[in-house]
Amino acid sequence: MKISFLVHSLYNIGGTIKTTLNTAEALADLGHEVEIATVFRRREEPLFSVDPRIKVVVLVDTRKTAPALTGTDARLAAKPSRLFPKTEPRHPQYSRYADERIIEYLRGCDADVIVGTRPGLNIAIAAHAPAGLVKIGQEHLFLDRHGRRLERKLYRAYRGLDAVTTVSSTDADSYRKRMPRIAANVHFIPNSIPATSLPPSDVTARTIIAAGRIEKIKRYDLLIDAFAMVHTEHPEWTLRIYGHGRETKTLRTLVEGRGLHDSVQLMGTYTPIDAEWVKGSIAAVTSEIESFGLTIVEAMGCGLPVVSTACPYGPPEIIDSGVTGLLTPPGDVEAFAKALRGLIENEEQRRAMGAAAREHAKRYTPARIGAEYAALFESRLSARERTDTGPALDAASRATSPDSALDCHSVDMSTLRLAGPADRLSLAQAETTVTPTGADGAAFVNLDDLDEGVWTVLRDGAPVTAGRVDSRALTRAGARADTTGIVVPYAEPGTGALLVRVWRRDWFAEVTSVSWHEARLRVTGRLLGPGLPKGTATGTATLRTDPSRVHALTTTTDDDGFSVEVDTDALTLADGGGAGLWDLRLSFDPESAGIRVGKVFDDVALRKNTHRFPERVGVGSGRALRVKPYFAIDNQLSIKVTEAD
């Protein structure tokens, strides 16, 4: 069969795109020809990797580099869509020009099966796809989300489809009940999630992980409040939230207001995410509604028990409460905190639930879900008496994925394993190149071979895309007191290139806490490294643009810790009124500038956007100034002083 998927944008990030790619790849594995038509192209490359066997067709190119529309096309692009229902949330993004491009594609589509992936596109398929095609409408949300007006439009349109699929059985029941004329054509097929190639979490890390769009419906505010309740009893535990969205700023403000900035990190978007799930011991989901729960299955597949609200629709269908995780009433912060607390205090229960969760996640593999879709498509083709669909591709004719993405694994704090032959790999920094050592088809690089700074991983002399970066071993790196450095692999934001950040020194001042006490900023931390000097330490704040301007800080040290206090009212703007950037240092020698105070001993190579601190408005030099502590690009702690708005 030839199968075509019609999607809103392959170039965004989200569950619909990810599961469409998973299913498309599984169908290609079965020997079918697969293409994905994306209405919009908003960036150069998709955020998720696309199997080279899958053809991508772009209908509307909205990149800044795309040729400008002219004439009739430009006039149509300025008019709102007539094809896409106004009650569909994506309607404002569509135009008459997009309508024309969609209709043109559908009328010329030579596939055996065409699959829509959201209501507006399903309506377009029902109205304009050729009569001989098998037409499938996927529902990745749920019927109750659409409202009565859109529901009526869908009922009329969906009579022209051969099948409608939902990602939850509850939603399938809703369609059958409220759209009785198409009840026989409604099928429940869950989303697909590939099994991770990484070893599962050992659930001993003191980390809770949540992931998904940072939107109101995800109720991350409830998660923060529940974590705050648990954190008072278990201050060694941390929370990481992965994703981005419109509520990111609001969530940061809530974290700061709860005084959790040292324990809660907003990590941004990571792809693939399984290398992050394995760093946790508990997964948390606090949504009001989940049509499916892609992140739940991802976490389960990595061996994490999942604490989730029992919200409609997906979580109660996926999680067997007490076996693979725990379900709590939606909106009940105390119940959620109790569930977290129970797993935090019982490692054996975490381990048992994690193992059961990992086994249950096998239900959702792309091979299994792809086979369900293939069976549905074939049954609908047979019903149309179109049994001669051409020979399936044999295994030998299938394209194989290029070796573009490179996986890596942090063996420990100082050793990195690269998944490739050593004779093809190297690491480059400026004019310096280091060749890794090889063993059993893998390559190894060590801290002793690398200078401090950023290294680019090369394959055959060219930068390589990061695959799975399994750096979970680094999440416990701070416990080492005799280290001389750390090797942190990461994907470069924007390009996805595999980079390695190295910190290498005789000793380190590693930040553990930053807190405000009126106008004084207190920074505490650990002193690490075999070259740690003896004697009395002095902390300083130095103006970056004028190193002669130095403020001495109140400083205390003991055998392995330090504390400095900054009188922020003494800090000023830079000369000329620009932002004053003050770098914090610690020195045991009055004749030496010492070392920067920072935080480098974990898996976060770029901490500036993941670890934020509260800011303060005070008075310095007779004017209102905003004082903001932050981690600079090198993960060293600085203070930014600007004029208050």
PLM segments and residue spans:
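Short hydrophobic beta-strand element within catalytic cores of glycosyltransferases
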Residues: 305-309
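N-terminal strand-loop element at the rim of the active site
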Residues: 7-13, 26, 30-89
